[in-house]
Amino acid sequence: MLASSRQPRHAFVEHHHQLSSSTLHRSGSPQTGTLRQDATTPTLATSVGPSMDRSASDYSQSGLPSPYPSNCGDNQSEAQSVTVDTSSAAQYNASAQQEVRSNNPGNYSASATPTSEYGVYPASARSSSFPDHLQQRSYHPASNHSGSSGDPSIAAPSPTYGAPAQYSPYGPPSQDMSHGYAHPGSNLYAQPRPDWSGYGQQHGAPLTPGHHVFPQTPTSAPPQARPNQVYSFVPIPGAQQHKRPRRRYEEIERMYKCGWQGCEKAYGTLNHLNAHVTMQSHGQKRTPEEFKEIRKEWKARKKEEEAARKADEERQRQAAQSQGGSTEGQAGSDVSQSSNGYAGARGAVQLPPIGYQAGQYPAATSTSVQQQPLPDYNASYMQGYQPASPYGGSNQAMYNQR
């Protein structure tokens, strides 16, 4: 039995291997049968000592299994622990495990993952009434600064991930905070965000990653002074005064005639005539010298027409002034009479000011409008007003006073 139980330690320590109580009952090996008999019979606990080197890792916790869930316990010890019913675990002797650990130190290979039975306090030092979850919480450090703990029950961080940062999660960040997340192959946050440009970098630390960093260009800053340039593609009415206005069809003075083989076409500009000549193949293009005499005649005729028009306008203006002089005299007399009549009528219909009181302003000298009943109406209204009986005889007397 001793020879068969001396097996390599690493064959029974696996992360994903979990034994159940059913496998303990169903296994036909003499070792597991002895273990089941040991768990149920306390008198044979000492005879199972040599066989416990195989199943020592199955009972990961050296004390009683706690009914409370562990807050800080690692998942490896939970995965390796065997779900033994409480009746058999309560009768298990804790000294047998301690004896197995002291007698068989060479069976634990260095490559095997350590279990959680290496606690800070030995099994004999803790009382049976001490809660196991409080004991497990005691040796878990609050913050792991070095990346590997002294307690073998806590697994070291995987080498594929970087070591944790060297600052407290609630303390002020260190100088390497500004480039702690910058990787050489990523340009995602190489340039600061535009919305955060006003705040600057943390603690004034410059960005020193392995890639290029572009200068910070805050968008919230006022734009640079630009020259007053107006980029308008819509023609401004006052900007193109040098161009002549387009004339209507009946207003065109057609002085440029074609004359090619009896062609009667005439145009208002030489450019339009040359377009006609080119399109219709009516000879060579015309030159301004050909129409020099025609233009002189046209200008002279234009001047005569302009002079005649101005003379006609002047004559009409003088006639209007002569007629306006006689009418202005009559209008002046009418205006004086109407102004006097308006003044008298205005005095008759003039209303008193807002703060009018009897005797403060002289009454208007007019018989058509009487302003005297206004204060009497106020006095009678205030005297005869009774809230209890608004339809009483006093109100009727007030209306009868008029």
Curated annotation (Swiss-Prot):
Its main location: nucleus. Keywords: Coiled coil, Metal-binding, Nucleus, Transcription, Transcription regulation, Virulence, Zinc, Zinc-finger. It is found in: Nucleus. Residues 302-317 have a biased composition (Basic and acidic residues). PROSITE patterns: ZINC_FINGER_C2H2_1 (PS00028), ZINC_FINGER_C2H2_2 (PS50157). A zinc finger (C2H2-type) spans 256-282. Disruption phenotype: Impairs appressorium formation and growth in plant hosts. This is C2H2 finger domain transcription factor CON7. The lineage of its organism: Eukaryota, Fungi, Dikarya, Ascomycota, Pezizomycotina. The gene is CON7.
